């Protein structure tokens, strides 16, 4: 894709900017003449040089008789227009090349995405162990609340943590399920 756009840019630079090679759409004099007396308005296009871009050289055939030509030409607005179709073509080729490259990149990512996001068996096992551990600790906390008093400092801290976790869980249920404020 980069090679194609590079070739297009080099081709554009190597094309000689000669006015003789340009088509009538590239260089033109456009005269817009409004309605005049019983003559309807009209748009005239002519391939003439910039110095000849006026009503007398562009408007052919002249729709008014000889003595009204000057008054008619004063109403007409003539503009010289020049564009480079080669540059337009090069820009379109570059644009299409970029869009094509992005589409290819998107297709590549769609093909590679399942390989990248493949679930890792080890992380799934760790996640399942954490869930099981949480469930066991909740059950142990519920049992320890009603059971005999803990003897060691470590067991007391664990018991306090379990009570705190149960309290937080209860508050979550109250707030999210029952939509009540914290007490």
UniProtKB/Swiss-Prot annotation:
Cytoplasmic side, ranges? 111-183
Q: Which residues form a coiled coil?
A: none
Q: Which residues lie on this side of the membrane: Extracellular?
A: 21-89
Q: Report what the protein is called.
A: Proton-transporting V-type ATPase complex assembly regulator TMEM9
Keyword entries, A-Z: Endosome, Glycoprotein, Lysosome, Membrane, Phosphoprotein, Protein transport, Signal, Transmembrane, Transmembrane helix, Transport
User: How would you summarize the oligomeric state and partners of this protein?
Assistant: Interacts with the v-ATPase accessory protein ATP6AP2 and with the v-ATPase complex subunit ATP6V0D1; these interactions lead to the assembly of the v-ATPase complex.
What's the source species for this entry?
A: Homo sapiens
Entry remark concerning the domains of this protein: The transmembrane domain (TMD) is essential for the interaction with ATP6AP2.
GO CC list: intercellular bridge; intracellular membrane-bounded organelle; late endosome; lysosomal membrane; lysosome; microtubule cytoskeleton; mitotic spindle; multivesicular body membrane
Q: Which Pfam families match?
A: Tmemb_9
Q: Which InterPro entries match?
A: TMEM9/TMEM9B (IPR008853)
């Amino acid at each position: 894709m980069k090679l194609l756009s590079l070739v297009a840019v080099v081709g554009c630079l190597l094309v000689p900017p000669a006015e003789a090679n340009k088509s009538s759409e590239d260089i033109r004099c456009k005269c817009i003449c409004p309605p005049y007396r019983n003559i309807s308005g009209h748009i005239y296009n002519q391939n003439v040089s910039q110095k000849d871009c006026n009503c007398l050289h562009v408007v052919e055939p002249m729709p008014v008789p000889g003595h009204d030509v000057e008054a008619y030409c004063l109403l007409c607005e003539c503009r010289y227009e020049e564009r480079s179709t080669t540059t337009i073509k090069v820009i379109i080729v570059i644009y299409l090349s970029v869009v094509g490259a992005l589409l290819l990149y998107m297709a590549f990512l769609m093909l590679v995405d399942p390989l990248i996001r493949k679930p890792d068996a080890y992380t799934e096992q760790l996640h399942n162990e954490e869930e099981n551990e949480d469930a066991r600790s909740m059950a142990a906390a519920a049992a320890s609340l009603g059971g005999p008093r803990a003897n060691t400092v470590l067991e007391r801290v664990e018991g306090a943590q379990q009570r705190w976790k149960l309290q937080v869980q209860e508050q979550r249920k109250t707030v999210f399920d029952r939509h009540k404020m914290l007490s």
